[in-house]
C-alpha cells in the first residue's frame, strides 16, 4: 500500500509499506476519499519532532471494504463505508468495525465523509436549536457552512451568518442564511433592532431583540468568541464548536450577566459521535445536507501538501479539500 506522511515542516512523502491485515473486530478499507482537516495543520506545518518518525495524518475517511477480520462479519467486501479512524492519506487503512457506517446509496464517497459532520451534529444535539429559533453562526469555513445546513434541518426562524470574508458570506446566503454580517457589524446589528423595537430593520424575523437564542462559534480563535458574545440573547446559549487547541480562550463576562449557557461543542466519546454520525448521514441520504458546495478542491495522494497550503493561506475559493488516493 501507499501512504503519505509528513517528513519535515510542510513536506510530505509517499512511501510504500506492507498492507496491514485486519485483526479481530477490524476491517481493511480501500480509501476512496479522505478530508483534509484544520486540526492537522500544526503537525503539517511543524513536521516531526527532533528524532521523531514521519507523521501519518488524515482521519476523515470514506472507502470500500476489501477484507474483514474475525468478529466483523456484518461488513461485506465491496461495501462503501465511512467512520472514525485513520491514517487516511493512504490507499488502505485498518478501521474498527464498530466505528463504521454505510455510505448512503447514490452518494459519492467524497460527499459522504462521516467524521466531520458527525462532530457538528453532536454539538448541535446539545444545544436548544428548535423550530422557530434564532441561530447565529460565527465563522463560515467548512465547519460553519456545515453547521448552517444542519441547523436548517431544525426549521429555525432566522439564521445569522458572520464572517469577514465576503465570499464566505455569499456562500452562507446561498445555503439558506437570512442575514450575513461582517464581524465589525455585529455590535450594531445586536443593538439596532432592540432600540427600534419590532419594526427595526436589523431583525430579520421582526423580533424586538435580534440577538440569537443559540450562537454557534466555529472559528477556533479568540476573536471569534468575542464576536459571538454580543449576539447571545439573555438566557441564550453559546456553543463553542471551533477547535481552540492551545492557550487561553477568554470569554466576555457579559455572558455571565446575561445568564447565558455555554456549551463545549467538542465530544471525546465515540458512542455519542457514532450516534450523531447516524443522524448526520440520514440528512445526507435525504439531501438535507450536501458536501457538494463545500468540497472545493480534490487532490491525489501526491497533493497533500498543496491541500494544506491552500487551507493555511485561506485561499480564495477554498472551503474543503479531499484527498482521493
Regions found by a protein language model. Give the residues of each.
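Glycine-rich cofactor phosphate-binding loops and adjacent beta1-alpha1 units
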Residues: 175-261
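C-terminal substrate-binding/catalytic core of Rossmann-like NAD(P)-dependent dehydrogenases/reductases
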Residues: 248-296, 306
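Conserved beta-strand positions in the Rossmann-like core of class I SAM-dependent methyltransferases
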Residues: 66, 160, 239
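C-terminal capping/lid region of NAD(P)-dependent oxidoreductase domains
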Residues: 2, 209, 239, 243, ...
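Glycine-rich beta-strand-centered segment in the early N-terminal region that forms part
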Residues: 18-35, 47-87
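Mid-domain Rossmann-like dinucleotide-binding core that forms the NAD(H)/NADP(H) cofactor-binding site
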Residues: 110-185, 201
Amino acid at each position: 500500500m501507499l501512504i503519505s506522511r509528513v517528513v519535515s515542516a510542510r513536506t510530505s512523502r509517499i512511501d510504500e509499506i506492507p498492507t496491514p491485515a485486519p485483526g479481530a473486530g477490524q476491517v481493511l478499507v480501500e480509501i476512496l476519499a479522505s478530508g483534509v482537516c484544520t486540526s492537522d495543520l500544526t503537525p503539517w506545518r511543524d513536521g516531526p519532532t527532533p528524532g521523531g518518525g514521519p507523521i501519518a495524518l488524515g482521519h476523515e475517511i470514506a472507502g470500500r471494504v476489501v477484507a474483514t477480520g474475525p468478529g466483523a462479519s456484518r461488513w461485506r467486501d465491496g461495501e462503501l463505508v465511512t467512520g472514525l479512524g485513520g491514517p487516511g492519506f493512504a490507499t488502505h487503512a485498518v478501521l474498527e468495525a464498530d466505528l463504521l457506517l454505510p455510505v448512503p446509496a447514490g452518494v459519492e464517497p467524497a460527499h459522504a465523509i462521516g467524521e466531520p459532520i458527525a462532530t457538528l451534529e453532536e454539538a448541535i444535539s446539545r444545544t436548544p436549536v428548535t423550530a422557530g429559533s434564532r441561530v447565529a453562526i460565527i465563522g463560515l469555513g467548512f465547519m460553519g457552512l456545515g453547521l448552517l445546513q444542519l441547523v436548517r434541518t431544525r426549521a429555525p426562524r432566522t439564521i445569522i451568518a458572520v464572517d469577514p470574508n465576503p465570499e464566505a458570506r455569499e456562500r452562507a446566503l446561498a445555503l439558506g442564511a437570512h442575514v450575513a454580517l461582517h464581524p465589525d457589524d455585529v455590535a450594531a446589528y445586536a443593538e439596532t433592532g432592540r432600540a427600534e423595537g419590532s419594526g427595526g430593520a436589523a431583525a430579520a424575523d421582526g423580533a424586538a431583540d435580534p440577538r440569537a437564542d443559540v450562537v454557534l462559534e466555529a472559528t477556533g480563535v479568540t476573536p471569534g468568541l468575542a464576536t459571538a458574545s454580543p449576539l447571545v440573547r439573555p438566557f441564550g446559549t453559546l456553543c463553542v464548536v471551533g477547535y481552540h487547541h492551545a492557550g487561553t480562550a477568554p470569554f466576555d463576562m457579559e455572558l455571565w450577566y446575561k445568564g447565558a449557557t455555554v456549551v463545549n461543542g467538542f465530544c471525546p466519546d465515540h458512542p455519542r459521535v457514532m450516534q450523531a454520525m447516524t443522524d448526520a448521514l440520514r440528512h445526507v441520504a435525504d439531501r438535507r445536507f450536501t458536501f457538494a458546495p463545500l468540497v472545493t478542491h480534490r487532490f491525489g495522494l501526491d497533493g497533500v501538501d498543496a491541500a494544506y497550503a491552500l487551507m493555511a493561506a485561506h485561499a480564495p475559493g477554498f472551503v474543503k479539500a479531499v484527498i482521493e488516493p
